[in-house]
Design a protein with these regions (language model features):
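Short, conserved micro-motifs composed of acidic
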Residues: 140, 202, 217-252
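Catalytic palm subdomain of template-directed nucleic-acid polymerases
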Residues: 99-115, 185-212
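Active-site palm subdomain of RNA-directed nucleic acid polymerases
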Residues: 41-59, 160-189
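Hydrophobic alpha-helical membrane-association signature
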Residues: 75, 162-166, 200-203
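Short, charged alpha-helical motifs in flexible N/C-terminal segments and linkers
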Residues: 9, 20, 80-91, 208-227, ...
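Non-catalytic, peripheral interaction segments enriched in hydrophobic/basic residues
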Residues: 63, 181-184, 189, 209-235
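Conserved pre-catalytic core of RNA-dependent polymerases
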Residues: 1-153, 189
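Short, conserved phosphate/pyrophosphate- and ester-handling motifs at nucleotide-, phospho-/glycolipid
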Residues: 155, 159
Length: 254
């Protein structure tokens, strides 16, 4: 299993300034035998979870028959109905900083137990996650090996499913409408009165509590609120990484 714990990280450029490391996505290259084992474990997990109906219906990332398009269409239908009735909609777009890399292993394993995953399968997943080593490779040059203390490996076969299970209970903390695409969360409410704005702010507060409990960090700079309609948009706030309350940046769409 040692070879399965070794990964070469290749930085894949996303967008923005190329000299900013934050603008690169780390992708893990692992051994072929490890990927084969991951595929077998993933198939077993999916078959088991399908019998339980465990994955939230609000999750559209890495799910068969669901996609960015299904996520968008479900939302647009509700928003259009609200506009036809003469109401606006406030939509919160929430971003987690280095979400896949931040997943704490012990807490993930505890969550897996709540879904009925025990015994040898759980021990294999624990072995897969813990005592991993990585080094970064760029144009044939490599860094030294370092130990990975948290996260599910991006670019791996099993990593996305483990991440979905980790965030699977997030919708349970939210009163209003929510859709997820892996680590991207979208929460909205039809605004008929000030009480609806207040309810959406309460969801933000609940999301902050979930994040604190599970050691995930909201990226306040990338969180946005979009108001659909002609009425004024309310101000919403959340805690930044320093614990200070900051107002979420607004995008207005008429």
């Amino acid at each position: 299993m040692l070879s399965g714990r070794l990964a070469v990280i290749i930085p894949i450029f996303k967008k923005g300034a190329k000299d900013d490391p934050a603008n690169y996505r780390p992708v893990s290259l692992t051994s072929v035998p490890c990927k084969v084992m991951e595929s077998l474990v993933k198939d077993s997990l999916n078959a088991f979870l399908a019998t339980k109906g465990s994955i939230s219906v609000h999750q559209h990332g890495f799910m068969k028959g669901r996609s960015c398009l299904t996520n968008l269409l479900e939302s647009l239908e509700k928003w259009t109905q609200a506009l036809d009735e003469g109401f606006g909609v406030d939509v919160l777009y929430l971003d987690y900083r280095k979400a896949f890399d931040s997943v704490p292993h012990k807490r993930l394993l505890e969550k897996l137990k709540t879904y009925g995953i025990h015994g040898r399968l759980l021990r294999w997943i624990q072995s897969f996650l813990e005592a991993r080593l990585m080094r970064v490779g760029i144009r044939g040059s490599f860094s030294d090996w370092i130990k990975i203390l948290s996260g599910v490996p991006q670019g791996s076969v099993l990593g996305p499913l483990l991440f979905l299970l980790f965030v699977n209970d997030l919708p349970d903390w939210i009163k209003n409408s929510i859709r997820l695409f892996a680590d991207d969360a979208k929460i909205w409410n039809v605004i008929r009165s000030d009480a609806d704005n207040h309810s959406l702010q309460e969801d933000l507060n609940s999301l902050s509590k979930w994040s604190d409990k599970w050691l995930m960090r909201l990226n306040s700079d990338k969180c946005k609120v979009m108001h659909v309609g002609h009425s004024p948009c309310a101000a919403y706030s959340l805690k930044d990484e320093a614990g200070n309350r900051v107002t979420i940046k607004q995008i207005k769409v008429s």
